[in-house]
Amino acid sequence: MKFTKMQAYGNDYVYIDAIHQELNNLPELARFVSNRHFAIGSDGMVLICPSDKGDFRMRMFNPDGSEGEMCGNALRSVAKYVYDHRLTDKTELVIETLGGMQKLKLFIEEGNPPGIRREDVVEGHGYAANIQADIGEPRLDTKVIPVAAELPQFVEQPVQVNDRLFHMTAVSWGNPHCAMFVENVSELDVEKYGKSIEYMTELFPNKTNVTFVEFVRRDYLKIREWERGTGETIGCGTGCCTAVVAGVLTNRCDRKVTVEQIGGPLEIEWDEETNHMFMKGPSHTVFEAEIDVSQIM
């Protein structure tokens, strides 16, 4: 099986062209390739598939084999993948996900894409150096997210988690997220609280991604992310967007914010006119290779 390892702010996935390769037993395949000790190692597996609704379809699997609805960093990386591998010449794409149709804009630089061996250079094609994703409007309806609460929206609501009280804001990008502000995010026991909140199914029936946010200034936030089905990751695009939604709704931050993750800063803008959320940043190809998966397939 041919694959490409890519990362965006340290959020690394194994990307597989499922247009030209036939794949089976996907949950087991995701568990296998994601294993950092016995296989490739990643935050999950992403398939690039054909789509009847958009230019391409993205399927994302977590390391535990569960299928996720959306991931902002993976989405941007898919856009880079299809352009850099010359599956398209378009610089504006619509990609189908379980979380909905997503619009992306690619910013092209000349030359061959780093990390991809190319004998021939296509004049004027270049490679995607930066990718902006329009992931649409944040969904705040508790029934949509879902949150088991008798409230139309779940904003800055007090929730006791183990020995600590958090004030949570919940949002969906096609997958459930919640965010809460803390004093010093670098000193927080993210595994302790993140895992407890993820599995708080009496509040989040489908479990949830968890974003811990530290206020630095109105145009700068810091986060740490606990991803549903994955654990702590050093980058999460939708987590950054969730932090900005929570910050704007509680008047802590502006609509255009740099969000610092462990893997690096991501530019986020919640456009007031369209109500759409935009994230912009690079994605990088780490390497390409083949692996024998005959024991799984």
Q: Where on the chain are the PLM-derived regions?
A:
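Juxtamembrane transmembrane-helix boundary motif
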Residues: E92, M101, Y127-V161, L165-M168, ...
